[in-house]
Amino acid sequence: MRTGLLLLLTAGVAAAAVPSDANLDTILAKIQQRYERQRDALCGYTGTRVYTLHNSHLSHDTVMKYRVTMSRSSGKHFKLISEQHAGFLARHALTTLVDAEPDSRKQEQQGRLDRANYKFALLGEDVLNGHRCYVLHLSPRRQSKYLVSGKAWVDVESYAVRRIKGQLAKSVSFWVGKPEVEEDFANSGGFWMPSYNSSLSHVKLVGEATVTIRFSNYRFQRCGQ
């Protein structure tokens, strides 16, 4: 997950013809510049995540709410706030996803959109939630649970990644396998952060399961403050 990256399913989106002024090298360079500006400005944050597991064999959806704290010095930490209808297997499946959350520094290096991690192709333009985006095809250069084989939607104006959709390039765990994932990002207080994540997994002993994650209540520690 991506949360960093992990986690779903929406219908595929057809890309329009590639605009004449689009250049893949320029797009990737501007993505990197925007990433570096955010990395240099953001020293930590706290937030809330609500994980929901749906499975046809369960009488109720399992919901687990976490408080997330991230800092450059200590990485990312989760604290369980509440849970509902969390039977043993469902709880184990969700805690496995949380435990698989990558170390922030490792995710920065191994999961970001750059030529060290991916081969790219510019598919064209699309409108996503009212915003013009470039659509990039993502082909991971190696098997990694931090990489996605699929597509990325990049905002034409800000060069921020608004959506990543596809399948993880490597199994997250024995229990979860390789989920089909979709993660949306939004501007929060000047920083582009995950806002919604959904994944379809085939969980051992539970069967096909859909997991959604809703991100909220971000509070940021800006560097130098």
Where are the regions that the model predicts?
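Positively charged n-region of N-terminal signal peptides that target proteins for export
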Residues: 1-4
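Structured extracytoplasmic
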Residues: 17-149, 156-161, 169-179, 186-193, ...
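Beta-strand-dense domains in secreted/periplasmic systems and polymorphic toxin scaffolds
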Residues: 164, 195-197
